[in-house]
């Protein structure tokens, strides 16, 4: 959520930056006018309340003097009616202001590239070289079916499209991957957390999913619970409404959880395979940091995600998202894209973002500065470390062999009982 004071005091710069994200300047002018109207009404309300207090004192004095106070009483009743009307207008305007400020995206950082969509993202670097195959390669969904480790047909029967069963060494591979990821993040100082897989609406508001992206979620009927779209939601809301001792910052959390997404607007996209599912596992990283440290923490978080891909020896690239492709809450985002041979392209496997104080303001997560003792909004960061299903897809395709088998990356073998190869026979 944006700071209305910042918009008020630095209107032109904020309008220019939000225009890069597709926000019409008229929207901000309407917001500014509404804010001005609110402040004028507030002044009138406070003045009327002061007059009412004066009238009340005059009535009390008149009664003590046994004098007629009917005129003062009439004045006070008139003032009370005026105050009631002013306060009703303030409540209405506050609601309109909240709608404005909670639906505006975050302000992009100064170094975020200007662009309309993903075609204008900027590649930063690449790691590893895509493998050259001397045989006809298979897509991961065909490999999974041929090896009898992934079953989409029965997933569709039991639930519906975009669901599947992992089985046998497929299930063990998935488990090996996320255990490896969690162990690697723990080495970097992250505290492992097992969060709730359902959260309330306040939590969804805190991280920016609600109200704007409500259609992308799965809500439970007849209660306030929502299935989490990412562990970012419960992890970030862990400190919602709290004041943290500044000496404790930065704080690192990591968690593996299922993620549930309706994929509204994705009809026809990635209908086969593990790239786009309604339910998938993801290892998440979340950080709470002081404002002056947050961009250094973003670089470190991105490096933590890269570390996983490097140890798995999966080729990838890092891109900086442009203004038109960033998520709603982000001020700056790096995407990691892993090489998927059957598609002959890189696909997103991690997204690491600094939201600055955008989520912290919505969730009221603050810290007490140990130097000046003041309570301030902190910065929150989040990143995938990594999407587990997409990692399975990348391993199956990059490590496939001519005989239809798949070699297990060396770093995962201790997590899967020493198994080196998944073959049709195994």
From Swiss-Prot:
It is found in: Cytoplasm. The keyword ATP-binding applies. Its EC number is 6.1.1.11. It comes from the Bacteria. One of its GO terms (biological process) is seryl-tRNA aminoacylation. It catalyses: tRNA(Ser) + L-serine + ATP = L-seryl-tRNA(Ser) + AMP + diphosphate + H(+); tRNA(Sec) + L-serine + ATP = L-seryl-tRNA(Sec) + AMP + diphosphate + H(+). Keywords: Aminoacyl-tRNA synthetase, ATP-binding, Cytoplasm, Ligase, Nucleotide-binding, Protein biosynthesis. ATP binds at residues 261-263, 348-351. Pathway: Aminoacyl-tRNA biosynthesis; selenocysteinyl-tRNA(Sec) biosynthesis; L-seryl-tRNA(Sec) from L-serine and tRNA(Sec): step 1/1. GO terms for cellular component: cytoplasm. L-serine binds at residues 230-232, 284, 384. GO terms for molecular function: ATP binding; catalytic activity, acting on a protein; serine-tRNA ligase activity; transferase activity. Its main location: cytoplasm. It holds the Pfam family Seryl_tRNA_N. Gene3D superfamilies: Bira Bifunctional Protein, Domain 2, Serine-tRNA synthetase, tRNA binding domain. Consists of two distinct domains, a catalytic core and a N-terminal extension that is involved in tRNA binding. Catalyzes the attachment of serine to tRNA(Ser). Is also able to aminoacylate tRNA(Sec) with serine, to form the misacylated tRNA L-seryl-tRNA(Sec), which will be further converted into selenocysteinyl-tRNA(Sec). Homodimer. The tRNA molecule binds across the dimer. This is Serine--tRNA ligase. The lineage of its organism: Bacteria, Bacillati, Bacillota, Bacilli, Lactobacillales. The gene is serS.
């Amino acid at each position: 959520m944006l700071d209305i004071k910042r918009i008020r005091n630095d209107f032109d710069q904020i309008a220019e930056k939000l225009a890069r994200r597709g926000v019409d300047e008229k929207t901000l002018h309407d917001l500014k006018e509404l804010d001005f109207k609110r402040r004028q009404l507030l002044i009138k309300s406070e003045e009327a309340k002061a007059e009412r207090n004066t009238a009340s004192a005059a009535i009390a004095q008149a009664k003590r003097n046994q004098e007629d106070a009917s005129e003062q009483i009439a004045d006070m009743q008139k003032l009370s009616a005026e105050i009631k009307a002013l306060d009703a207008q303030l409540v209405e305007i506050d609601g309109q202001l909240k709608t404005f400020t909670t639906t505006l995206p975050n302000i992009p950082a100064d170094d975020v590239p200007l662009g309309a969509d993903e075609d204008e993202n900027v590649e930063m670097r690449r790691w590893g070289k895509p493998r050259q195959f001397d045989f006809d390669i298979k897509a991961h969904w065909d490999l999974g079916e041929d090896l009898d480790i992934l079953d989409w047909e029965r997933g569709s029967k039991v639930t519906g499209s975009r669901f599947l069963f992992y089985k046998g060494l497929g299930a063990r591979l998935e488990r090996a991957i996320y255990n490896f990821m969690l162990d690697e993040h723990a080495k970097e100082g992250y505290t492992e957390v097992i969060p709730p897989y359902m959260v309330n609406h306040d939590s969804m508001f805190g991280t920016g999913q609600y109200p704007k992206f409500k259609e992308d979620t799965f809500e439970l009927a007849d209660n306030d619970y929502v299935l989490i779209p990412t562990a970012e939601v419960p992890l970030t809301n862990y400190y919602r409404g709290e004041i943290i001792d500044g000496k404790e910052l930065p704080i690192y959390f990591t968690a593996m959880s299922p993620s549930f997404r309706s994929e509204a607007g994705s009809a026809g996209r990635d209908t086969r395979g593990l790239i786009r599912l309604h339910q998938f596992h993801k290892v998440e990283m979340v950080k709470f940091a002081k404002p002056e440290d947050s961009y250094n923490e973003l670089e470190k978080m991105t490096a933590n995600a890269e570390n996983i891909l490097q140890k798995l020896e999966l080729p990838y690239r890092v891109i900086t998202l442009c203004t038109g492709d960033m998520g709603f809450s982000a001020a700056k985002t790096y995407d990691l894209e892993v090489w998927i041979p059957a598609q002959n392209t890189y696909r997103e496997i991690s997204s690491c973002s600094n939201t600055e104080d955008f989520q912290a303001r919505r969730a009221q997560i603050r810290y007490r500065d140990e130097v000046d003792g003041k309570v301030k909004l902190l910065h929150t960061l989040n990143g995938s470390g990594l999407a587990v299903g997409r990692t399975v897809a990348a391993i199956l395709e990059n490590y496939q062999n001519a005989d239809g088998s798949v070699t297990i990356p060396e770093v995962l073998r201790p997590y899967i009982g020493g198994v080196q190869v998944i073959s049709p026979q195994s």
